[in-house]
């Protein structure tokens, strides 16, 4: 099932039903016996308007968009006014200054105040990092302090929460009445590392009490708490959660109105930029013309762009990077469709060999319907490498070629599993699907597009990010399979992680397998938290945030109601791209 969003005068289908492995193309797919649902966007052939129509709609909107020249005077004044408020709170009320910093992050305006925020956190860390000092503060204040410090690379021991336990070793009974503190404790627990048992206890305790109290809460509070339980800040996209946080601020602080106004101004600027970028992507896709040659492949430039937009949503100035990254995302889908729809096993072996050669002369060995895709892949990635070289002085083509070779090899493994008619072990599946998910391709391209890895940069190498990328790939893969498992067409032989794990544990129920998958996601988040924390260098902060956004985006992509639609993603898309 797909629903349509009216965007910029055009109707854009944004399909959210799981990408069916059997039902959609059972007569054309060469590999129906084994088909993963990658990134969960079905190829609903025929439902997407031709790119030329989308291009025209975007062009029309470009002329009707409100003039950006009207913004700067008031916009800059609002930024300066907020900066002044930050200074005042830092001097007069250290705890409220932390609440202020948290609010800027949740509303997505913190990028304006990096120096001020850093100074506030530095002072706060110097005075509160000791567990003995924290015992004089409330659960809310300690939890917020813990969150902010870990988010910004300052280590605070989880032992600070021992101050809120009684002699029994359990969290104190009176905390059950502290809704505000419990919500912040739940948020703090999302930043745990492996082995931090007290944070596991904190998450279970706070979640259980808050869920139990929801029914008795006043409507606005119930909605606020419910949203935070479902989408904790650390594992969500700030621009999305900020929709709800705007209501949470209410009239609690005199600076709330100022922050809301600044957030709305930011949103106006961002929408204009995103619309222009989508126009560029549409133009590139239309000129490429591959959708005319590969008529069964997914023809969805808007959806390709969504990944780049959300991953880099915190950095509006990285417009060139978003557009360039979208091209890589598009080719992940195109090559995926070649493996799923167009190629026999022998043809796919030849295609993989051609990618391994990375030479235009290999085009002659390919079937006609693969030649154009192969040549444009080489053109596009070689072009990306050249742009990176011109911008940063180093050429990453060898690394980029390697990641595309790995992706196609992983796709080929899937095709061979399909040809054999059997499921791999759960571990074999996960090791291969980490690669075939496309996560490594996206993040490695992003790594170099953001200027990292050059000989003169010195602070971080690509290999330093491998574990971080691995955890994100597993999170994406498992969430993808959990989303696909809700598809009514599933029959237990579709090649998901759940199917492979169930095959090895035949006594487990579907609910138990589902719970195991969620536990695996939780473990990988803890590893991701640690890897992210360890990559604590100014030069890598933007890449780290973008990589985390990749993992955070997954629940938005794969959150369904009973009708197999995605109300969460629909709301986010409309909010970010509609005037």
Swiss-Prot record:
Subcellular localization, per the record?
Answer: Plastid, Chloroplast stroma
Q: Which residues are glycosylated?
A: 27, 204, 317, 382, 463, 507
What processes does the entry annotate via GO biological process terms?
Answer: terpenoid biosynthetic process
Give the stretch annotated as transit peptide in the record, renumbered to this chain.
1-66
Which Pfam families does the record cross-reference, listed alphabetically? Terpene_synth, Terpene_synth_C
Induction data: Circadian-regulation with highest levels in early afternoon and lowest levels during the night.
Q: Which residues bind Mg(2+) 1?
A: 336, 340
Give any Gene Ontology cellular component: chloroplast stroma
- Cofactor binding notes: Binds 3 Mg(2+) or Mn(2+) ions per subunit.
Q: Which InterPro entries match?
A: Isoprenoid_synthase_dom_sf (IPR008949), Terpene_cyclase-like_1_C (IPR034741), Terpene_synth_N (IPR001906), Terpene_synth_N_sf (IPR036965), Terpene_synthase-like (IPR050148), Terpene_synthase_metal-bd (IPR005630), Terpenoid_cyclase/PrenylTrfase (IPR008930)
Q: Which cofactor does it need?
A: Mg(2+); Mn(2+)
EC number(s) of the enzyme?
4.2.3.105, 4.2.3.106
Q: Which GO terms describe its molecular function?
A: (E)-beta-ocimene synthase activity; magnesium ion binding; terpene synthase activity; tricyclene synthase activity
Looking at its record, which EC class is this enzyme? Answer: lyase
- Record pathway: Secondary metabolite biosynthesis; terpenoid biosynthesis
Q: At which positions is motif DDXXD motif?
A: 336-340
Q: Which reaction does it catalyse?
A: (2E)-geranyl diphosphate = tricyclene + diphosphate; (2E)-geranyl diphosphate = (E)-beta-ocimene + diphosphate
User: Which keywords accompany this UniProt record?
Assistant: Chloroplast, Glycoprotein, Lyase, Magnesium, Manganese, Metal-binding, Plastid, Transit peptide
Which residues does Mg(2+) 2 bind? 336, 340
Known Gene3D superfamilies for this protein? Farnesyl Diphosphate Synthase, Terpene synthase, N-terminal domain
What does this protein do, in the record's words? Contributes to floral scent emission.
Q: What is known of its domains?
A: The Asp-Asp-Xaa-Xaa-Asp/Glu (DDXXD/E) motif is important for the catalytic activity, presumably through binding to Mg(2+).
Provide the protein name. Tricyclene synthase 0e23, chloroplastic
């Amino acid at each position: 099932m797909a629903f349509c969003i009216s965007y910029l005068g055009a109707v854009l289908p944004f399909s959210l039903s799981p990408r069916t492995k059997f039902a959609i193309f059972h007569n054309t797919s060469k590999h129906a016996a084994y088909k993963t649902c990658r990134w969960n966007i079905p190829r609903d052939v025929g439902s997407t308007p031709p790119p030329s129509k989308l291009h025209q709609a975007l062009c029309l909107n470009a002329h009707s968009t409100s003039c950006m020249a009207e913004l700067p005077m008031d916009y800059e004044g609002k930024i300066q006014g907020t900066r002044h408020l930050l200074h005042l709170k830092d001097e007069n009320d250290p705890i409220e200054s932390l609440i202020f910093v948290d609010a800027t992050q949740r509303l997505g305006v913190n990028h304006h105040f990096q120096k001020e925020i850093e100074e506030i956190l530095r002072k706060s860390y110097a005075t509160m990092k000791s567990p003995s000092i924290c015992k004089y503060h409330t659960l809310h204040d300690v939890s917020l302090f813990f969150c902010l410090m870990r988010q910004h690379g300052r280590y605070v021991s989880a032992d600070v929460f021992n101050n809120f336990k009684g002699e029994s070793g359990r969290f104190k009974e009176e905390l059950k009445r502290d809704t505000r503190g419990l919500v912040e404790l739940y948020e703090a627990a999302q930043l745990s590392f492996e082995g931090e048992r007290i944070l596991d206890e904190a998450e279970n305790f706070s979640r259980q009490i808050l869920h139990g109290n929801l029914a008795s809460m006043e409507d606005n509070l119930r909605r606020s708490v419910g949203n935070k339980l479902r989408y904790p800040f650390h594992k969500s996209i700030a621009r999305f959660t900020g929709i709800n946080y705007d209501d949470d601020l209410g009239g609690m602080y005199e600076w709330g109105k100022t922050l809301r106004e600044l957030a709305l101004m930011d949103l106006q600027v961002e929408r204009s930029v995103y619309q222009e970028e989508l126009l560029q992507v549409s133009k590139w896709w239309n000129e490429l013309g591959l959708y005319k040659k590969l008529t069964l492949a997914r023809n969805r430039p808007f959806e390709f762009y969504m990944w780049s937009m959300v991953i880099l949503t915190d950095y509006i100035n990285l417009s060139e990077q978003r557009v360039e990254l979208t091209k890589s995302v598009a080719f992940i889908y195109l090559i995926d469709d070649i493996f799923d729809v167009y190629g026999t096993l022998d043809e796919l072996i030849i295609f993989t060999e051609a990618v391994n050669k990375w030479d235009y002369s290999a085009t002659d060995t390919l079937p006609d319907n693969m030649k154009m895709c192969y040549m444009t892949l080489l053109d596009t990635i070689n072009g990306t490498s050249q742009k990176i070289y011109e911008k940063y002085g180093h050429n990453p083509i060898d690394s980029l070629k390697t990641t595309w070779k790995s992706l196609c090899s992983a796709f080929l493994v899937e095709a061979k599993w399909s040809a054999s008619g059997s499921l791999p072990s759960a571990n074999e599946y996960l090791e291969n699907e980490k690669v075939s998910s496309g996560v490594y391709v996206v993040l490695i391209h992003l790594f170099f597009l953001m200027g990292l890895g050059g000989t003169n940069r010195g602070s971080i190498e690509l290999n330093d990010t491998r574990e971080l990328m691995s955890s994100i790939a597993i999170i994406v893969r498992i969430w993808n399979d959990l989303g696909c498992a809700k598809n009514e067409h599933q029959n237990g032989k579709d090649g998901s992680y759940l199917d492979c794990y169930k095959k090895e544990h035949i006594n487990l129920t579907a609910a138990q397998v589902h719970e195991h998958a969620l536990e695996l996601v939780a473990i990988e988040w803890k590893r991701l938290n640690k890897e992210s924390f360890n990559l604590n260098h100014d030069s890598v902060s933007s890449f780290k945030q973008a990589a985390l956004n990749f993992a955070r985006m997954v629940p938005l992509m794969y959150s369904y109601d009973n009708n197999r639609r995605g109300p969460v993603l629909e709301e986010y898309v409309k909010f970010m791209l509609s005037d």
